[in-house]
Amino acid sequence: MEISHILEDLVYDNGVLPREAIEAAIVKHNQITPYLLKILEEAIDHVSDIIDDDCYQGHLYAMYLLAQFRETRALPLIIKLFSFEQDIPHAIAGDVLTEDLSRILASVCDDVSLIQELIETPRVNPYVQAAAISSLVSLVGVKKLSRGAAIRYFGELLNYRLEKRPSFAWDSLVASICALYPKELFYPISKAFSAGLIDKSFISMEDVETIIHEESIDSCLQEVFSSTDLIDDTLEEMEKWLERFPFES
C-alpha cells in the first residue's frame, strides 16, 4: 500500500476502521513517520479547522502510531497541540484526552522536563495537566523515571509549582502520589485538602490515610510496574474508541 493511500485512509473518517492502512503504516514505520509528524505540525496550525471538520481524524491516528513507534520527536508536537486553552483539547481529541493522553505522552517521552513544563503552564486545560501528571507515574511504571524523582517533583507541585485553584489537575496529582505511596507528602497533601483544592468525591483524605496504613512503597511500586501499559497496538487502541465502525472485511 502506497504511503499516499495510507495517509488518505487515516486522515478522514470513512465509516470504517482503516485496518489495512494502520497495518501498512506499521510495516512502513520508517517511511511514514515523517508524514505523521507533519500531520501533527499541521494540526497545531489548523486547530479551528479540525474542530469544524467532524470527519478529520489524522492527528489521532498520528499520535497513536507515533506512540506505538516510540517516536520521541512527537513529544513536543503533542504537547503543543494540547497546550491550547479552554475546551479546545477536548474538542480535538474527545475521550482520548482523559483516557489515553497520559499513555501517549509516556510512550514518546525522552525529556521529562517538557511534560513538567506542560503541567506548570498557566491556563492549560486541567484535564491535559492531569494526563501529564499521570504520565509521570507511567514513566515510573516502565522504569524510565525513578519513584524518588517523581515524588520530589510531585511535592514541588503541591507546594508551589501548581496553581492553587481547585481543578482535576489537583485530583490527579493526589491520586498519582497515592499510586507511588504518599507517606512522604502527607503534610502537603493534607494542606491541599484543607485549602479545598481536591474533589473529595474523587479521592479523600481518608483514602490517602488508608493507603499509608495498608500499603508500602514496595507494594505500590509493584502495582504500578504490573499495571502500566504504554501504546503498543494502534489497532487495538483505536478499536476501543471507534466501536461504531465495523471492521473492514
Curated annotation (Swiss-Prot):
Origin: domain of life: Bacteria
InterPro entries given for it?
DUF1186
Which Pfam family, an example, fits this chain?
A: DUF1186
Protein family (similarity comment): Belongs to the chlamydial CPn_0206/CT203/TC_0475 family.
Return the protein name: Uncharacterized protein TC_0475
What is the source species?
A: Chlamydia muridarum (strain MoPn / Nigg)
Name the lineage: Bacteria, Pseudomonadati, Chlamydiota, Chlamydiia, Chlamydiales
